[in-house]
């Protein structure tokens, strides 16, 4: 964010708590260019890439958090994690980045699509908003359930890009979870499990599986 002309970085404490409660140690990763250029999302210098490589080489797992937009730094972090088989958990915007970036295809797809369905998917403060149908995939392996109920606070969604697996749908047909094959652990969820771990065991299991995969990497 830009506040009074200065770049400010924020991280919801729920992400921090979810990682710590499962035995992980959080480490924030961002590029110096992002600070210097005041949110110029199209710039990533060689020096910044070198700094990112140095930091990311020390990471056992990558949590792509929610937010309002993404930049070249986010794309580079995800690309690094995919190429180096580092466990990934993408949440809300983090899942949308995973689902909109095909690093192995030169044709870049459209990013996201604004929601226009029967369910209001942006409901802050609600513990539960809608059901999700879980398909065979990584999410099912973690939860061993065919459906769950989740919170929801997103205005955009992704479409099927063929290079990822669809792990869950909402009742109105939006993609709610994805995974990437041939990767140690790469799961994206459209809802916010970090906000639910204190009252929903399934959300705790998602973070537990992510941290365990990270410890083993």
In which residue ranges do the predicted regions lie?
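N-terminal beta1-alpha1 cap of cysteine-dependent amidohydrolase-like domains
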Residues: 1-93, 100, 114-147, 153-155, ...
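Active-site-proximal beta-strand elements of phosphoester/diester hydrolases
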Residues: 187-191
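Post-Walker A helix-loop "phosphate-sensing" segment adjacent to the P-loop in P-loop NTPases
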Residues: 102-110
């Amino acid at each position: 964010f830009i506040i009074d002309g200065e770049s400010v970085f924020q991280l919801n404490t729920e992400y921090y708590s979810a990682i710590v409660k499962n035995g992980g140690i959080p480490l924030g990763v961002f590029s110096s260019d992002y600070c210097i250029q005041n949110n110029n999302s199209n710039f990533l210098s060689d020096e910044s890439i070198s700094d990112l490589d140095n930091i990311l080489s020390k990471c056992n797992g990558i949590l792509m958090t929610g937010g309002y937009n993404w930049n070249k730094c986010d794309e580079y972090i995800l690309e690094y994690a995919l190429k180096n088989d580092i466990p990934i958990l993408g949440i809300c915007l983090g899942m949308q980045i995973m689902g909109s970036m095909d690093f192995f295809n030169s044709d870049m797809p459209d990013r996201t699509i604004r929601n226009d369905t029967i369910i209001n998917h942006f409901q802050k403060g609600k513990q539960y908003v809608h059901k999700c149908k879980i398909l065979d995939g990584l999410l099912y392996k973690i939860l061993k359930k065919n459906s769950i109920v989740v919170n929801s606070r997103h205005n955009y969604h992704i479409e099927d890009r063929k290079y990822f697996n669809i792990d869950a749908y909402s009742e109105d047909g939006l993609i709610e979870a994805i995974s990437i094959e041939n990767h140690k652990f790469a799961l994206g969820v459209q809802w916010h499990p970090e906000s639910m771990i204190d009252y929903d065991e399934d959300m705790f299991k998602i973070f537990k599986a992510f941290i365990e995969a990270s410890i083993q990497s």
